[in-house]
Amino acid sequence: MEYISYHTSSDLETRQIGYKLAHSLPNGSVVALVGDLGAGKTTLVRGVASGLNIKEVVQSPTFNIMKIYLKGDRPLIHIDAYRLNDANTDIGLDEYIGYENGLTMIEWPMFIEKLLPKDTIYVELTNTGEEERNIKISSDNPKILEAIKNV
């Protein structure tokens, strides 16, 4: 799997990467966000929401599991799978993952891995300092990597 990597020095720079992703990814894209607690997953989603002109406050939907933002340039489906496991993944999430007219961002994707499409884009976030992060974006689809190369 090929990848592109970035280093950000602040939450603002992490949100800017998300903003640019919103403009680079085609409809139906599924983005799996991988990283420890506090790694910047939700911060990146906030940037994506900003890039889609979504004005609502974006918070991790940990207890709701999913939040759908419809008031923007295109829909954003934000899933936090942390509280899920194989026994309780059959709650209809598959209807929203890869929503054809929008973007799907999934925090803690390893808990619903069997629901992820083959062409899922993986974004791995690693803290390297207080607000510094390494961001690695990978995909098996070379067209996706080409689209986000200039992010």
What are these regions (language model features)?
Residues M1-K20:
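N-terminal pre-Walker A segment at the start of P-loop NTPase domains
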Residues G38:
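Walker A (P-loop) phosphate-binding loop of P-loop NTPases
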Residues I68-M110:
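Conserved nucleotide-sensing/catalytic segment adjacent to the nucleotide-binding pocket
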Residues K41:
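Conserved lysine of the Walker
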Residues V31-L33:
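Hydrophobic anchor at the beta1->P-loop junction of P-loop NTPases
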Residues E2-I4, E95-V151:
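Short phosphate-coordinating micro-motif centered on Lys-Gly-acidic
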Residues I54-Y69:
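Short beta-strand-centered segment that lines the nucleotide-binding/catalytic pocket of NTP-utilizing
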